[in-house]
Each structure stands twice: as C-alpha cells, then as structure tokens.
From Swiss-Prot:
Species whose genome carries this gene: Nostoc punctiforme (strain ATCC 29133 / PCC 73102)
GO biological-process terms attached to the record: gluconeogenesis; glycolytic process
Residues the entry annotates as binding ATP: K205, G296, E327, G356, G357, D358, S359
Enzyme class: transferase
EC nos: 2.7.2.3
Pfam family, any one: PGK
PANTHER family: PHOSPHOGLYCERATE KINASE (PTHR11406), PHOSPHOGLYCERATE KINASE 1, CHLOROPLASTIC-RELATED (PTHR11406:SF23)
Protein name as annotated: Phosphoglycerate kinase
Alphabetical UniProt keywords: ATP-binding, Cytoplasm, Glycolysis, Kinase, Nucleotide-binding, Transferase
Family listed: Belongs to the phosphoglycerate kinase family.
GO MF terms held by the record: ADP binding; ATP binding; phosphoglycerate kinase activity
Complexes and interactors: Monomer.
Gene it is expressed from: pgk
Amino acid sequence: MSKKSLASLSSADISGKRALVRVDFNVPVDDQGKITDDTRIRAALPTIQDLTQKGAKVILASHFGRPKGVDDKLRLTPVAKRLSELLGQEVIKTDDSIGDEVAAKVAALQNGQVLLLENVRFYPEEEKNDAEFAKKLAANADFYVNDAFGTAHRAHASTEGVTKFLSPSVAGYLVEKELQYLQNAIENPQRPLAAIIGGSKVSSKIGVIETLLEKCDKLIIGGGMIFTFYKARGLSVGKSLVEEDKLELAKSLEAKAKERGVALLLPTDVVLADNFAPDANSQTVSIENIPDGWMGLDIGPDSVKFFQEALADTKTVIWNGPMGVFEFDKFAAGTEAIAHTLAEIGKTGTTTIIGGGDSVAAVEKVGLADQMSHISTGGGASLELLEGKVLPGIAALDDA
C-alpha cells in the first residue's frame, strides 16, 4: 500500500496553494478545558512546518470528542492557542468548518499562514461521509494531506470523502511513518518477530491474534484475556475475567499456533487481588494454584523473566495492550517490566513498535517513550492495519 507522500511535493508544486490537512487534534482536556497532553498536536508539527516553509496556505481540519451537533465545550479554541505556541506563529481560528466565514478567512491567507477550522464533527455529515459536505470542505483548498493516522480506519468526509475533490491527495509525515513501521513489521520484518498482545478481552483482539499467528515467530499474551485461555485448558481461574463464549476460540488459537510452529506464550504466574480496587489485598501464585474468590490483575515476576528470555533474541517486537491493570500502581509491575525490557533490547538494534492504545500510555507513564523505535498514534487504526485490513483514509490517497 505505497502512497504518495508530502515529501514528494516541492516548493514549486505547492507554494501559494491551499492545503487542506486532516490532523488528529483529539487531545485530552481537564474540567477547565485545559489540554493535559499535547502529544497529538506535536506529532503533526513536521507536516505543518514543511507546508508553511514551502509557502503553502495551511487549512487544518480535525475532530474533537464526540459532539452531538455544535457543543461549545468541544470547540478547538484551546488547540489553536497551543498550536500557536508550538509553531511560534499565530494560528487563525474559524467558528465553522464550511461556509462564508471560512471562505473569507481562507481568501485572506498569506503564504505560510495557518488556519484551524472548527471541529468537523459539529456536522453529523462528517461521520456519514456525506459527499456534499466533503465537497464544501474541499472547496477552500487546492490539494489534500492526510496526517491523521488515528482516524484513518474511518471513512469520514474529512478523511475519505474530500479526496474525490482534491488532487493530489497525499500522506503527511506522521501517516507515512506509521505505514512504514507498521506495514514493514507485518510484511517484511527483521526476524525473529515477536508480538506481545495484552488487554482484557480476547474478543477485541481476535483479528490481530489470528493475523499475527500467520506472521510471527513468537506470540506473547498477557492482560485479562489470559484467563480465557487458562479456563480453556481446564485450569481454575477464581473470579478472574473470562469470556465463556470464547473458550473454544482460545483452544483453536493454541492449536493453530502449534500447527504453524509459533511459540504462543502465556504467563506462568499471576498477581491476584481479592477485589477490583487499587488497594486490594494481593498475592502472587502460579497459574495452577489460583484460589476461589480471587481475581488476576497482573502477570507475576516469573512470567516477566519468562517473557524477557523469549524476547532476548528478537529483532522486531510489536506490543499492543497492557499486561495487567496498570492504572492501579499495585498491579502495574508486569506492564512496566515489559516497557523496560523493550527499551533494553532496543539498545541492541531490535525494532520496538508500540501499537497504539493503552500500551502507549504505559510506556509514557514509565518515561520510556523516547526509547522505542516507533509509538503509534492510532489505537483502532493500528489494530486494523496489524490485522491486514484496508484503512479507508489511506486507500483514498494517491498511489506513489
């Protein structure tokens, strides 16, 4: 899926032209509306700065939250302010994403100026990928850049619909980097390739586990979903989370791994709690000895050693999903140990890819984000790409 990228456009191609850039500025904010983490805004800077330096007029479009119609609490005003600080130049803000006010402000733009449209999801037509709305969004621009990997798995007006009206339609630097790392890891990895899949439910990770069984040399499973595998093996799991309707699936995944010669590794010990709370009583036991009335909330120290040994000779590692309930400090050790392990093996040339979602938060929590080869900005989009699915927002871009 090789796509035309912004890097292929020179100053001569785009100077004075109006660029509609889809970014993902869906950042977390506190009760006062202050941004608590600007990672997503900073992630878009290389694309925005390249466009301004090449003399384009930059029009940014993003969603923010899940508004039902216009919602003053979900306006992009704090984002415009933060982006202005990061760019060191004024970011012009509109109160709408289409219409006369937008057209007038775009017409007044000088080369190298940046304008941020209001939250595109104020219009229900955005998520319906309405062609008329897409046409209105596109009307103010000459070409299109998609740098919002986090929404690339959605066929919305600002991610897919606008490409029908704007040419060229290219990938921004963030999207290009995501595709390069995630697709390479699946299609052409340095081996041995290991995947670490965590999270609470097998059901949400079935697709990715099945695809990775075709590609991986080792598959490490952690998080709440391990108990469905244990129960399928006939072990007692106390009151741990189990998806009863997925027991047969767990058996078939283990059988499939065996058949394909893939090492499917489950934890050997677990940290138990007497209830689901940050201050619960805890004990560590082997997986054969889980007593009634207790639930597993993390992997144990022996499992950490077992996984570290399995990862020692790998050349590529993809990690998606935590090993336990890392939001509770008492049950965060397993997840944090995996983060430290990846940072260590990364120093000796192993490519370490953090595939979006909670594992990103975990790596950031322990301050190791800058020691990973690549941290994906997309949760659902990363998973779907790892599953081998076509992402509509990427498919719609011009081929390289």
